[in-house]
Curated annotation (Swiss-Prot):
<dbReference type="GO" id="GO:0005537">
    <property type="term" value="F:D-mannose binding"/>
</dbReference>
<dbReference type="InterPro" id="IPR000985">
    <property type="entry name" value="Lectin_LegA_CS"/>
</dbReference>
<keyword id="KW-0732">Signal</keyword>
<feature type="binding site">
    <location>
        <position position="167"/>
    </location>
    <ligand>
        <name>Ca(2+)</name>
    </ligand>
</feature>
<feature type="binding site">
    <location>
        <position position="163"/>
    </location>
    <ligand>
        <name>Mn(2+)</name>
    </ligand>
</feature>
<feature type="binding site">
    <location>
        <position position="169"/>
    </location>
    <ligand>
        <name>Ca(2+)</name>
    </ligand>
</feature>
<feature type="glycosylation site" description="N-linked (GlcNAc...) asparagine">
    <location>
        <position position="154"/>
    </location>
</feature>
<dbReference type="InterPro" id="IPR050258">
    <property type="entry name" value="Leguminous_Lectin"/>
</dbReference>
<feature type="glycosylation site" description="N-linked (GlcNAc...) asparagine">
    <location>
        <position position="82"/>
    </location>
</feature>
<keyword id="KW-0325">Glycoprotein</keyword>
<dbReference type="InterPro" id="IPR019825">
    <property type="entry name" value="Lectin_legB_Mn/Ca_BS"/>
</dbReference>
<keyword id="KW-0430">Lectin</keyword>
<dbReference type="GO" id="GO:0046872">
    <property type="term" value="F:metal ion binding"/>
</dbReference>
<feature type="binding site">
    <location>
        <position position="172"/>
    </location>
    <ligand>
        <name>Ca(2+)</name>
    </ligand>
</feature>
<keyword id="KW-0106">Calcium</keyword>
<feature type="binding site">
    <location>
        <position position="172"/>
    </location>
    <ligand>
        <name>Mn(2+)</name>
    </ligand>
</feature>
<keyword id="KW-0464">Manganese</keyword>
């Protein structure tokens, strides 16, 4: 949840949206022409159920009585320190194909709330991630978010994550931020994030295989403010062929630095072309996600 000392140029916006009751974020998945077949995985959770059999819950994660995915422990309405939880979709995603060399495009949208009793002592954050199917909670939690053992880069992790970081650790930039993480909690790219305590955040993350571009957008409907971050990421060189996707979150490692981490809804779609193909510019599929 940090960035290197040489910080690259970022695409960043902080602008009002004209839509009051809904946000519709649309993007194009550029698919290959003359496609014979494709592997498509798609699911949607408008809310969550206590007996949600298609989710794998790790650590302190649970589904609350409100139908929300509660990633870290809350007791009597108060978040607890040193809590880590993760939730992953049960079915692995075929993210690239070794026999063809092709890589999947994907998009995921979700809404979440992070609420701290004391805003100045928020910790530590929440992340969406892709990891090997058997990946379990890693490290001490806290600023590593249950993803990594340390802040150093290690290719053996085989993890890509987008973190929403509410606490400034030693490896972080000097601000709350959204970061793109590749095999390290020390993000390859970040954008300053004006976290709004207790407010619903709507997120869209998309990956364009044709351009190897990972794009993140976060919007607060209450203030009509948005944040955008984009980076070049070669999934095939980082991830195994099959991954699981999901969320992870952690509270601080001392008693005062705590917050809640609740996912309200989640949708995901991936498309991996498996048939013969020709040019790249004719077959364009449109996917649109709307938050109401």
């Amino acid at each position: 949840m940090a960035t290197s000392n040489s910080r690259p140029h970022l695409l960043q916006t902080h602008k009002p949206f004209s839509v009051v009751l809904a946000i519709s974020i649309t993007f194009f998945l550029l698919l290959l022409n003359k496609v014979n077949s494709a592997e498509i995985l798609s699911f949607s959770f408008p809310k969550f159920a206590s007996n949600q059999e298609d989710l794998l819950l790790q650590g302190d994660a649970l589904v609350s009585s409100k139908g929300e995915l509660q990633l870290t422990t809350v007791e009597n309405g108060v978040p607890i320190w040193n809590s880590t939880g993760r939730a992953l979709y049960y079915a692995p995603v075929h993210i690239w194909d070794k026999s063809t060399g092709r890589v999947a495009s994907f998009a995921t949208s979700f809404s979440f709330v992070v609420k701290a009793p004391v805003a100045s002592k928020s910790a530590d954050g929440i992340a969406f991630f892709l990891a090997p199917p058997n990946n379990q909670i890693q490290g001490p939690g806290g600023g590593h978010l249950g993803l990594f053992h340390s802040s150093g880069y290690n290719s053996s992790y085989q993890i890509i994550a987008v973190d929403f970081d509410t606490h400034i650790n030693a490896w972080d930039p000097n601000t709350r931020h959204i970061g793109i993480d590749v095999n390290s909690i020390n993000s390859t790219k970040t954008v300053t994030w004006g976290w709004q305590n207790g407010e619903v955040a709507n997120v869209l993350i998309s990956y364009q295989a044709a351009t190897e571009t990972l794009t993140v957008s976060l919007t607060y409907p209450s203030s009509q403010t948005s944040y955008i971050l984009s980076a070049a990421v070669d999934l095939k060189s980082i991830l195994p062929e099959w991954v699981r996707v999901g969320f992870t979150a952690a509270t601080g490692l001392t008693t005062q630095y705590v917050e809640t981490h609740d996912v309200l809804s989640w949708s995901f779609t991936s498309t991996l072309e498996t048939g013969d193909c020709g040019a790249k510019d004719d077959n364009v599929h449109l996917v649109s996600y709307a938050f109401i």
